[in-house]
C-alpha cells in the first residue's frame, strides 16, 4: 500500500495538512475546479521560478494564495510588477479579492518537488538520467535534515525503443510508516524522445503526535574542554589529611577527626609553640633543689 500510493494522500490528516483549506456545501465542485485552474495558471510561464507548492485558503469574500518558491525575485518581479500581474489575473479568474503571499523555500535541496524539477530540467538539456539522479541524491544528502532519498525516472530512458523505469536510493525511506515525514514530488521532463516522469521521495525523520522530532544534527557535539556550561565545583577549604582514616576535611569517622585534630594541634607556629611551652612550664609542679649540706652528705 505505502509503495504505491501518494505519500501526501496516505498521511493526510495524520502527519500532513491539506494544501487547500476552505469549506463549501453546494459549491464544492466549483471550488475544486477553481483551485486546479489557479495552480495551472501559476505554473504556466513560471518554470524558472522553482515553485514548490501553492496553498489556497478561502473566506467569504477573499482568497488567500501562498506561493512557496525557491526564487522569490522571479515571482515578485521588478518593483513588484510580476506579483501585481499575477494578483490581477487571479482576481479575474476567481471574481474575488486575492491576497498573494510569496514565501521563500530556505533549503531547496531538501524539497522533493524542487529536486524533481531540477532532475527534469537536466533531462530536458540532454544530460544522462543516471548522472542527473546521482547528482540530485548527493546534493540532497548533504542537508542535515535529510535521512534518505529515492529518485525514480520512467519513460524512454536514453532514447530506448521500449520505456522502462529506474530508481536510485540512498539512506532509509520507510514509505509504509505513517509517522515518517515523507516529502514527495513529481515532474515531467519534455525530451525529443517523449516525456520522462521524475518522482522523488525524501525522508526527513519521524513525526510524533503531529510534531517533528527535530534531531539537531547540525549542532555538532563540542570537543572536550569546550562543552557547555556546567555547575562549578563548590569551593573547598584547605585540604587536611587525617592520618587514622585517610579522609580529608571535617568528614570521615570519629577516629579520623580525632587524628586530624591531633595533627592540627601538633602543627603549630613557633610563636604558638613558645607560648604553649611557657604555659606548660608554669603549670608544671615545682621540685625543690637539694641544699648544699645535703649534697655533701650524699
Swiss-Prot record:
Sequence segments annotated as region (Disordered): 212-298
Biased segments, Basic and acidic residues type: 214-237
Residue ranges with Polar residues bias: 265-278
Claim: Mitochondrion is one of the keywords in the record: no
One protein family per Pfam: KH_2
Role: Binds the lower part of the 30S subunit head. Binds mRNA in the 70S ribosome, positioning it for translation.
Protein name: Small ribosomal subunit protein uS3
Lineage: Bacteria, Bacillati, Actinomycetota, Actinomycetes, Pseudonocardiales
Primary gene name: rpsC
Amino acid at each position: 500500500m505505502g509503495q504505491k500510493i501518494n505519500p501526501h494522500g496516505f498521511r493526510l490528516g495524520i502527519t500532513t495538512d491539506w494544501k487547500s483549506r476552505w469549506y463549501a456545501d453546494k459549491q464544492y465542485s466549483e471550488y475544486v475546479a477553481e483551485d486546479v485552474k489557479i495552480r495551472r495558471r501559476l505554473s504556466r510561464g513560471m518554470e524558472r521560478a522553482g515553485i514548490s507548492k501553492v496553498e489556497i485558503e478561502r473566506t467569504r469574500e477573499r482568497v488567500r494564495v501562498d506561493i512557496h518558491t525557491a526564487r522569490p525575485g522571479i515571482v515578485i518581479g521588478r518593483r513588484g510588477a510580476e506579483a501585481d500581474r499575477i494578483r490581477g489575473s487571479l482576481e479575474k479568474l476567481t471574481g474575488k479579492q486575492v491576497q498573494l503571499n510569496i514565501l521563500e523555500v530556505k533549503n531547496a535541496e531538501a524539497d522533493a518537488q524542487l529536486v524533481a524539477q531540477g532532475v527534469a530540467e537536466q533531462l530536458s538539456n540532454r544530460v544522462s538520467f543516471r548522472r542527473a539522479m546521482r547528482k540530485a541524491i548527493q546534493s540532497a544528502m548533504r542537508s542535515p535534515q535529510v535521512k534518505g532519498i529515492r529518485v525514480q525516472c520512467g519513460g524512454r530512458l536514453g532514447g530506448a525503443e521500449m520505456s522502462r523505469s529506474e530508481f536510485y536510493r540512498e539512506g532509509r525511506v520507510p514509505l509504509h510508516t505513517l509517522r515518517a515525514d515523507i516529502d514527495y514530488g513529481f515532474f515531467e521532463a519534455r525530451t525529443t524522445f517523449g516525456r520522462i516522469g521524475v518522482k522523488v521521495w525524501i525522508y526527513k525523520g519521524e513525526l510524533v503526535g503531529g510534531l517533528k522530532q527535530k534531531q539537531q544534527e547540525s549542532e555538532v557535539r563540542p570537543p572536550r574542554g569546550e562543552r557547555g556550561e556546567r555547575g562549578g565545583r563548590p569551593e573547598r577549604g584547605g585540604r587536611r589529611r587525617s592520618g587514622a582514616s585517610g579522609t580529608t576535611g571535617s568528614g570521615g569517622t570519629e577516629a579520623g577527626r580525632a587524628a586530624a585534630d591531633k595533627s592540627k594541634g601538633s602543627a603549630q607556629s613557633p610563636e604558638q609553640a613558645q607560648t604553649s611551652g611557657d604555659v606548660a612550664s608554669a603549670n608544671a609542679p615545682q621540685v625543690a633543689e637539694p641544699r648544699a649540706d645535703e649534697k655533701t652528705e650524699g
